[in-house]
From Swiss-Prot:
Domain SAC: 106-441
Bilayer-crossing regions: 508-528, 535-555
Record localization: Endoplasmic reticulum membrane
Annotated membrane topology: Multi-pass membrane protein
InterPro entries, sorted: SAC_dom
Alphabetic keyword roster: Endoplasmic reticulum, Hydrolase, Membrane, Phosphoprotein, Transmembrane, Transmembrane helix
UniProt-recorded Gene Ontology molecular function terms: phosphatidylinositol-4-phosphate phosphatase activity
Biological process (GO), any one: sphingosine biosynthetic process
Class of enzymatic activity (EC top level): hydrolase
EC number(s) per entry: 3.1.3.-
Domain of life of the native organism: Eukaryota
Species assigned in the record: Schizosaccharomyces pombe (strain 972 / ATCC 24843) (Fission yeast)
Protein name, UniProt field: Uncharacterized protein C19F5.03
Length: 598
């Protein structure tokens, strides 16, 4: 536990008999033994260090000050952060509007992100990786950099570890994702079911601004989900772990927001993506083993080019460790026949049996078996269809584990153990919502099936509402969310000449939304007003304002790219901004994206 002190010249972080001192003027960090008596472990001034981040003019120390227990797994307490304190080094915040805007981006990211940590367990690594790497290096250096969300913010402190290994005690890797656990008793044995989803910080971002791969083979919306099952009684305890992954279709493609419900699809050829896709799968195979690839995108309409692109990439790679399976989710499960996901399970069952899962003798901390391979699932967003399929795979794995333990019979389903089945459904549904919130801004679709096992009309209506929310958020709000990701993860580093607030679009573009709003207000005021004391007859005014609404909407949709809330720190690779005599306009970068070319 770390104690925090501050004065005008220094920050001090104390832990037992050592201390980190940060000079507020220079930002220099130093380590020294603490000559004072070990600090009392008071909850009032105890903090958890997230790190420090430099904005335009000043640097900021970020401390987690409020937390709650999220889960307890294998005796390790896991916490979720509820409040961060962001403290300026030199108090320059009020001197610059751009600094304030960046500060607000930082604060909003910290407020909305589901951050988890443990003082005693490295959450960035799966149980299998933790057992494999045990004792090889210090915990910080052993952490999985893909999921170490505050690694960039912790850099000043990590750099000191070489000279002072004790500094690692102050650094707490945090993951961005979802963690929960719950227990029940079945046949006199305690069964604990836990779920951990780790979101990768590589190519992190929002739904339409991060798709596909980058040049280094990092996919958008990559998440590792680990299902941990602990079965214990008075004599023994055994732990099972099973890992699945999800990630965007590994190629160069994007959906470009243009105010339409289905954005413009752009994609490069498979030959251009082959090198990056090879990097991606080579890394995945080295970490997880053979890849059972489950592709859930539609085989017709808007999504067809991406299905074809993915299959062309797989053919070009021709890797015997990649096992490709296509499942037309919407066709097979149409008319709410979602039980037909079993068709996919039957198809991949031999590979699931071959890859197995990790088994750990908890009392002896000895690995009895390892998972060899992983199922990598995707749909377009890697959210809704992917959630359903991953939960079905998780159910299949858990059922087999319980049969192995003798909890249920060889032919009995998980639903025969009602308390455990309820836990399973709820944690997988909550997991779906958290992953979806981080990427799309809303909860997941189709969670009524995950939570109850059936598709309902109420669930379909909730999906409609969430789809409408996604449209609004993804078109008009996600730019700032993407900026926050890029700022916190170090993808963009502002300097003293940075300008954030400038809107240099043509005057017409900036005025049309206000004209539309004025016409809407005047139209409804006239429609519902009982007074006729206007310059024009109400009927004429209604016609004119209605025509103004139609003309404004037509203009907006005809120039849709100009009205999107684009990121201001780093534009997506498929977009560029050009300066014209009228102002700055956004255009699709055709050198990087050619429509429907696969």
């Amino acid at each position: 536990m770390v104690q925090f002190e501050a004065n005008e010249k220094q920050f001090k972080l104390r832990r037992e008999d050592c201390c980190l001192t940060i000079d507020r003027e220079s930002g220099a960090v130093s380590f020294e033994p603490d000559e004072l008596k070990p600090v009392a472990r008071s909850k009032e001034n105890s903090v958890t260090l997230f790190g420090s981040i430099k904005l335009k003019k000043d640097k900021y120390l970020i401390l987690a000050t409020e937390k709650s227990s999220a889960a307890q797994i294998l005796g390790h307490k896991i916490y979720r952060v509820h409040k961060f304190e962001v403290i300026p080094y030199r108090n320059l915040l009020a001197d610059d509007q751009d600094e304030l805007d960046l500060y607000n981006l930082l604060q909003n990211h910290l407020k909305t992100g589901p951050f988890y940590f443990s003082y005693t367990w490295d959450l960035t690594n799966s149980l299998q990786r933790s057992c494999t790497d045990e004792g090889k290096a210090s915990p910080i250096l052993r952490s999985d950099k893909r999921f170490f969300w505050n690694e960039f913010a912790s850099k000043d402190f990590i750099d000191l570890i070489g000279a002072h290994s004790e500094v690692s005690l102050f650094i707490t890797p945090m993951i961005y994702g979802f963690i929960t656990s719950a227990s029940t008793i079945v046949k006199g044995r305690t069964i604990t079911l836990a779920l951990i989803s780790r979101r990768s910080k590589q190519r992190a971002g929002t739904r339409y601004f991060t798709r596909g791969l980058d040049e280094n083979g990092n996919p958008a919306n990559f998440n590792e989900t680990e299902q941990i099952t602990i079965v214990s009684d008075e004599k023994s305890e055994v732990t099972y772990s099973h890992v699945q992954t999800r990630g965007s279709v590994p190629a160069f493609w994007a959906e470009v927001n243009n105010l339409r419900y289905k954005p413009l699809m752009v994609a490069n050829s498979a030959s251009m993506a082959a090198a990056a896709a090879k990097k991606h799968f080579d890394e995945q195979i080295s970490i997880y083993g053979d890849q059972v690839v489950v592709n859930l995108v539609n085989c017709k309409g808007h999504e067809l080019p991406i299905k074809q692109l993915y299959e062309n990439v797989i053919r070009r790679l021709d890797n015997p460790h990649i096992h490709y399976h296509y499942f037309d989710f919407h066709k097979e499960c149409s008319h709410m026949r979602w039980d037909r996901v079993s068709l996919l399970l039957n198809e991949i069952q031999p590979e699931l049996e071959e890859q197995g899962y990790t088994t750990l003798d908890t009392q002896k901390y000895r690995v009895l078996s390892r998972q060899n391979g992983v199922v990598r699932s995707n749909c377009m967003d890697c959210l809704d269809r992917t959630n359903v399929v991953q939960s079905c795979i998780g159910r299949w794995v858990l059922t087999n584990q319980l049969r192995k333990c003798g909890i249920i019979g060889a032919t009995h389903p998980l639903r025969s153990v009602i308390p455990l089945d309820n836990i399973f459904c709820n944690i997988w549904s909550d997991n779906a919502d958290y992953i979806s919130l981080s990427y799309s801004g809303t909860g997941a679709l189709k969670t009524d099936f995950t939570r109850t096992g059936i598709r309902t009309r109420k669930g379909a209506f909730n999906d409609f509402v969430n789809s409408a929310k996604r449209y609004i958020l993804n078109n008009f709000y996600d730019g700032a969310r993407q900026d926050a990701y890029d700022l916190v993860l170090g993808q963009f580093r502002p300097d003293v000449n940075f300008r954030y607030r400038l809107d240099l679009r043509p005057l017409t573009i900036r005025c049309v939304p206000y004209i539309l709003l004025a016409c809407l207000i005047l139209f409804f005021m006239t429609l519902f007003s009982r007074s006729s004391s206007t310059i024009l007859p109400p009927s004429i005014l209604l016609i004119l304002t209605f025509l103004g609404i139609v003309a404004s909407l037509y203009y907006c949709f005809a120039h849709g790219l100009q009205f999107i809330n684009w990121p201001r720190l780093l534009l997506p690779s498929f977009l560029r901004s050009d300066m014209t005599p009228e102002g700055r306009v956004f255009v699709i970068n055709r050198q990087l994206a050619s429509k429907h070319k696969v």
